[in-house]
């Protein structure tokens, strides 16, 4: 039993968290492409360094909002590069991601946002946001991803003049 316990701990300790993987590739292969996606027929690419900088800046911006400790932050979007970046920024800032299905109706969306006590919401690529937006409480601060303007604060504007977090913070 003792041997098994040590064996399991050694196996678990070899795995890196998503943030630790970002730090690793950010330093080892900064100019390699990490994320790419087509937007309006044009491919956009982000290197590990570029993703690291956006994540670090957004994490710094999130920290500047002085949210409650371990605040819940929602992500309402189909899969896209900024979904990954916002999830990493939430982790880096010390908060908790609340991923939301991109096809929720407004009633379900509202219940989840209220029940989870979400304090900030990222809004991105969605098929029919007009049917969903009524479920977002009016007092909830929202940030929209570039390329998907939903009349909220825009990601790029939020991080434009922000200093990135320099430390490689570890979360468990």
Segments and roles (model prediction):
Residues 13-34:
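A short N-terminal helical cap/helix-turn-helix that marks the beginning
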């Amino acid at each position: 039993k003792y041997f098994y316990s040590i064996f399991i701990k050694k196996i678990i300790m070899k795995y890196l968290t998503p943030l630790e993987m970002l730090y690793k590739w950010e330093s080892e292969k900064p100019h390699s492409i990490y994320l790419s996606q087509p937007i309006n027929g044009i491919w956009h690419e982000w290197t590990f360094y570029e993703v690291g900088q956006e994540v670090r800046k957004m994490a710094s911006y999130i920290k500047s909002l002085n949210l409650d400790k371990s605040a819940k932050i929602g992500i309402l979007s189909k899969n896209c590069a900024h979904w990954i970046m916002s999830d990493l920024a939430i982790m880096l800032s010390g908060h908790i991601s609340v991923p939301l299905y991109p096809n929720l109706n407004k009633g379900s969306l509202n219940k989840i946002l209220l029940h989870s006590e979400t304090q900030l919401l990222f809004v991105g690529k969605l098929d029919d946001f007009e049917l969903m937006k009524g479920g977002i409480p009016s007092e909830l601060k929202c940030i929209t991803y570039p390329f998907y303007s939903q009349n909220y604060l825009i990601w790029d504007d939020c991080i434009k003049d922000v200093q990135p977090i320099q430390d490689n913070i570890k979360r468990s």
